[in-house]
Amino acid sequence: MRLPTFIETFLSRTQVIRESKEYASSIYKIIGRNGIIGFSYTFANKGNGSECSPSLPTLYEVVADAHTHGASSVNSEKKYYDNEFSGLRNENGKFISKEERKKENGNNDIGNANRIKKVSYLVTPNGSLQKYNPQNGEITIVSNDMPSDPNDPTRVNENTINYIEPIENDINKYTIY
């Protein structure tokens, strides 16, 4: 499985929009006895509506991190730039250049990726999967096919999340939303 498809599989299974929480995980490399390289991910840490730190593997090399932004903040008191990596704008709200991105070291998505020198993937409320490469400062859209928040005014698809929740006291019955 190529890495972006792997990320899509992992991140499409989280309940970020319904819960309006961020989730974060580390992507790590596995080399089999026959030399074949594969990837896996750590159990996703659940954060709050605006931040989360990825869980880390014990014995494997981290090659990237992946996280989600919560639900769209369009109807919230506190507004965020939901559909982009944090750290992509300066204090005046203007986008920073690729060269400035590579130097960013604040406590934000771009700064964190730069400090650990690892690629970072982000799933946004509008349904896009983005990749930030700290080596060259580039942000690319990997996919526009992720689950999206119907409230997001910049929604790029009609993919909604079906959430299955166990009915209290009966593990054999589920409610589907």
Residue ranges with predicted function:
Residues R13-E19:
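Short consensus segments that form the blades of beta-propeller domains
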Residues T5-S12:
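Short Pro/Gly-enriched beta-strand edge/turn motifs at strand-loop
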Residues E19-K21, R115:
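A generic fold-level signal
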Residues R33-Y60:
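Betabetaalpha-Me/HNH-type nuclease active-site subdomain
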